[in-house]
Regions:
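Short, low-complexity N-terminal intrinsically disordered segments enriched in polar/charged residues
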Residues: 1-20, 24
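A solvent-exposed, acidic/Ser-Thr-rich amphipathic alpha-helical stretch
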Residues: 28-69
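Alpha-helical interaction segments
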Residues: 1, 43-45, 86
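Hydrophobic pocket/interface hotspot
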Residues: 10, 21-23, 30, 47, ...
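A beta-strand edge to alpha-helix "cap/lid" segment located at domain peripheries
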Residues: 52-113
Length: 113
């Protein structure tokens, strides 16, 4: 599976509340960076358990919808709306790196405006 197919399946599983299956698409050594809105700070998670745990703890109703995307070979960059019950939706740039059908890195950065 290429980057587009892998990320599309990952998001489909997230949005269908099949987060455990989505986590299986993460590489064992996956890395995730999450930028804090309005700050220069970033949270970094390493390993499938920690990165996957972030998605597993998101709770029912957590959704990630792609508004626009581009495939850059092994990278997939998307403009994504993140929705979570009880919280305002966020507009982020999601940068996925895929190798051998597994997501090896994911970086989420809030988009302004």
């Amino acid at each position: 599976m290429g980057a587009t197919e892998t990320v599309d399946l990952f998001l489909e599983l997230i949005n269908d509340d099949n987060r455990e299956q989505a986590v299986n698409l993460l590489a064992e050594n996956a890395v995730m960076g999450i930028s804090v809105p309005g700050s220069d700070e970033r949270t970094n998670l390493r390993g499938r358990d920690r990165v996957g745990g972030w998605f597993l703890r998101a709770g029912d109703g957590f959704r990630m919808y792609t508004n626009d995307s581009r495939n850059m070979g092994g990278s997939y960059i998307a403009d994504v709306t993140v929705m979570r019950p009880g919280a305002p939706s966020m507009h982020v740039e999601a940068n996925f790196r895929v190798e051998g059908g597994e997501i090896v890195s994911l970086f989420l950065q809030p988009l302004s405006g």
